[in-house]
Amino acid sequence: MSVKWEKLEGNEGVLTVEVDAEKVNKGLDAAFKKVVKNITLPGFRKGKVPRVLFEKRFGVEALYQDALDILLPEAYAKAVEEAGIEPVSMPEIDIEQMEKGKSLIFKAKVTVKPEVKLGQYKGLEVEKMDTTVTDEDVENELKRLQEDYAELVVKEDGTVENGDTVVIDFEGFVDGEPFEGGKAENYSLEIGSGTFIPGFEEQLVGMKAGEEKEIQVTFPDEYHAKQLAGKPATFKVKVHEVKAKQLPALDDEFAKDVDEEVETLDELKAKIRARLEEAKKNEAETALRNAVVEKAAANAEMDIPEVMIKNETDRMLREFDQRLQMQGLNLQLYYQFSGQDEASLREQMKEDAEKRVRAALTLEAIAKAENIEVTDEEVNKELEKMAEAYKLSVDKLKELLGSLDGVKEDLKWRKTVDFLVEHSKVAA
């Protein structure tokens, strides 16, 4: 097999590949064995038609596409390896010659990884976040816990105030007609949560249990239900019940309710401080690592192919969909509620996708320049940590992973970022 690589403008190029005639004939043989299984001719059982008769009846050309399906993947993979290129797009294949008894010649136009010209990546000046935990931080966390443990208590004679929870019936009308999804009974709504259309919750303030009222609002222009977007609406509302949050006292009993391992409020505060300190330390470490990568990437020069940004956007979209599914949602529901569509979400993700690609290419170039590699021992240690976290045996984890390439790549990038941090100038 002969291979020729021709670089074109930008990051594109063309592979010209010639597969010898003997290999082509073997591909045709394999194609015939596959195709003949479904062929029936008078005088022959299904799948038993002789090759000569098949070619006389249908022509050898009838085998070409199946032969190409067999030959091309292997030939293309070998050509890529021989040419020493790293394609980032699917190839555009053009068959120049395919004939029995002759070699197969095809061209494959592909986009490859860009060349990266590294700038400064050692001695980068970065600031480390302040990890001090103040008394105010601890008090704010206590208030948050207090809110979490608050009880809703019915206000017998009180009026609706911001922060209260009301139980209501409502029915909405547009142009005098009810609309789908505009009616509910005994619906719990926290005033000030922003759950409803702008202006709805505010108009409930001051009402009492048992009162009825008509509320005038206008649907936002970007509302997910296009038939309602921008239209004025009237809601008939009845308040059944008004509830207010009753915060628990900040005392030792509260501390024991929050954390069974403590006996006093002071002990709870100490645990909160320790937890916040650990969180700030981790946050500072992450910010520092992100900063050195961002600076190194900004100093590097490269021409990123659009297809790499598209591929990364695809990956980000899949990750987002998976996170939504963990919350019982999906992309289609998200589009409905947010008023966005796939095109606008992709556009929103594009800048971050480009940053991710730039960072990955920069780290790859630095790892190559500094001969940063991952040892088998490091891979095994990482597998042991992962297996322990997932409560699996290492063998079972390997079976589930299939390939260890992802683990090796993650470790390599981690080591490369470690290198950048070690060789940076960190200001406190």
From Swiss-Prot:
GO cellular component terms, semicolon-separated: cytoplasm
Name of one Pfam family that matches: Trigger_N
Family: Belongs to the FKBP-type PPIase family. Tig subfamily.
EC numbers, comma separated: 5.2.1.8
GO MF terms, alphabetically ordered: peptidyl-prolyl cis-trans isomerase activity; protein folding chaperone; ribosome binding
Role, per record: Involved in protein export. Acts as a chaperone by maintaining the newly synthesized protein in an open conformation. Functions as a peptidyl-prolyl cis-trans isomerase.
Entry-linked InterPro entries: PPIase_dom_sf, PPIase_FKBP_dom, Trig_fac, Trigger_fac_C, Trigger_fac_C_sf, Trigger_fac_ribosome-bd_bac, Trigger_fac_ribosome-bd_sf, Trigger_fact/SurA_dom_sf
SUPFAM superfamilies: FKBP-like, Triger factor/SurA peptide-binding domain-like, Trigger factor ribosome-binding domain
A biological process term (GO) from this entry: chaperone-mediated protein folding
Gene3D superfamilies hit by this protein: 3.10.50.40, Trigger factor ribosome-binding domain, Trigger factor, C-terminal domain
Gene: tig
Localization terms from the record: Cytoplasm
Name of the protein described by the UniProt record: Trigger factor
Lineage, broadest ranks: Bacteria, Bacillati, Bacillota, Bacilli, Bacillales
Catalytic activity reported: [protein]-peptidylproline (omega=180) = [protein]-peptidylproline (omega=0)
